[in-house]
């Protein structure tokens, strides 16, 4: 079993999610030991939701799942890089392909790119 340093950071490790083909950074989430093990077991990106305090397999609600193609770990064993196939087109809950869809321009943020889906329709909120 691969042992990562979950203790150093209070039980949660940052997990960077990147498109396996293009290299585009899709999102940053957090993994605890349980979500790490579930990701390894299932091949589907599973994170720890800090707001809901529960495991969160990406895309179960929206259909925008992340199939893990490769996993890398940093030199200190406390940061995870998931290279994924983003199925469904969008990684962000706002409907955008990437969570990094805000561009800093001087003293303001500008949204770049169009949403792939309408979150109101998908999440019924």
From Swiss-Prot:
Subunit annotation: Homodimer.
Keyword terms of this UniProt record: Amino-acid biosynthesis, Cytoplasm, Histidine biosynthesis, Hydrolase, Magnesium, Metal-binding, Zinc
Keyword presence, Hydrolase: yes
Transmembrane domains' residue ranges: none
Gene: hisI
Cofactor annotation: Mg(2+); Zn(2+)
Protein name: Phosphoribosyl-AMP cyclohydrolase
Entry's Gene Ontology molecular function annotations: magnesium ion binding; phosphoribosyl-AMP cyclohydrolase activity; zinc ion binding
The protein's role, per its UniProt record: Catalyzes the hydrolysis of the adenine ring of phosphoribosyl-AMP.
Subcellular location(s) of the protein: Cytoplasm
Gene Ontology cellular-component annotations: cytoplasm
Primary location class: cytoplasm
Catalytic activity of the protein: 1-(5-phospho-beta-D-ribosyl)-5'-AMP + H2O = 1-(5-phospho-beta-D-ribosyl)-5-[(5-phospho-beta-D-ribosylamino)methylideneamino]imidazole-4-carboxamide
Family per similarity comment: Belongs to the PRA-CH family.
